[in-house]
Amino acid sequence: IVSGSAVSLLFGGANCMMMQFRGRLFLVGDLSALRTAVNVAGTYSLDISAAFVLAALLSLVGCLLAISLGGKPDLGKKERLVTRGAALACAGIYTMAVFYGGIFETNGIRLTWNENDFEESPVLYFVESIRSMNVDQPEGYSKEALAAISAESALPVGGKKPHVIAIMNEAFSDLRRIGDFETNVEITPFIDGLTENTVRGAVYSSVFGGSTANSEFELLTGMTMAFIPKGAAPYQSYIKYEKDSLVSVLEAQGYTSAALHPYDASGWNREAVYDCFGFDEVRFIDEFQNKRYLRGYVTDESNFENLIGRYEARNEGERLFLFNITMQNHGSYKSESYESTVSISGHEGEFPQAEQYLSLLRETDKAVNELI
């Protein structure tokens, strides 16, 4: 009873946190992201519901009663063997059906999020996520098939080798694409005005509310999260050895590669992954110069100054591939020490998190202006 109550309470708490911060249930893949979650936990605030407090109190009362009543059931050796044998048999049947028999898929049940999951089947949802962690080879996959696709889409190779600077701006998005609203000031006037010598468009993200490294994985490898189990983090689960990527492709053409990220090296196992990708240089927060902070994160302006510094320090004739992951706009958006500069017209102060987020994007726009 005691151990069962503890496990149930921890599982329930994990689901409550995931619902608040990610808008979905707790999956087995989230266990591998625990260290990353701890790194950024200080910027989030958890709203503990009365229902969770009540559940914790009831669990505590149940444990105390179980301990005080104590004692073991008066069963003979034969009864104990039968009971344990039956329990093992049930566990074995359940394990075979769920993990090896694909009972959910056989009956047309897919592991997809819907609003009823939280109320009806969080445990089933978690258990099925364990089975789905094994990645199956897609149908029709082969080196020959890849070569054929490559031949069809091949573009003529030019003689120029420009410097390549790829910046993935943390949590940056255009909310105007999903809602019609006006603000007291323009949010991203410089970025919106980029037209000359510019190719632009919308990019759909495979993640929402977290799992930044999954978008990073897609960019650097050209692979898609469509074939990765829901809730999994490739950086922590699948990249364990040297892997072809944009890094290796450019290095084969004579480029020097460098990854810059103004945060801890432990986040999403980046230090080990960048080594597998073969980056020539890797810089995390300890190696950034003249750091300035906003809500506890290095500002984009300060980040870009370090990026410019590495570019200007290049050797004569050296071609660079600089890969930069920013941190300024990371959640949460409840900082009381930050005064928002953007307000939603007609709804001033009604959506403080949205206004703080939009204000941060405005700061990014200014930094991009200085960078370019």
State where each predicted segment sits:
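Transmembrane and membrane-interface helices of multi-pass
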Residues: 1-116
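Short, well-ordered coil↔helix boundary/capping segments
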Residues: 4, 27-31, 120, 355-365
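Short secondary-structure junctions and interdomain/linker hinges
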Residues: 17, 44-48, 64, 71-72, ...
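Helix N-terminus capping/helix-initiation residues
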Residues: 27, 49, 121, 142-143, ...
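Alpha-helix initiation and N-capping motif
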Residues: 31-34, 119-126, 188, 213-216, ...
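Membrane-interface transmembrane-helix boundary segments in multi-pass integral membrane proteins
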Residues: 39-56, 122, 126-130, 134, ...
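Membrane-interface segments at or immediately adjacent to transmembrane helices
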Residues: 98-167, 179
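Solvent-exposed soluble domains appended to multi-pass membrane proteins
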Residues: 150-160, 166-169, 174-372
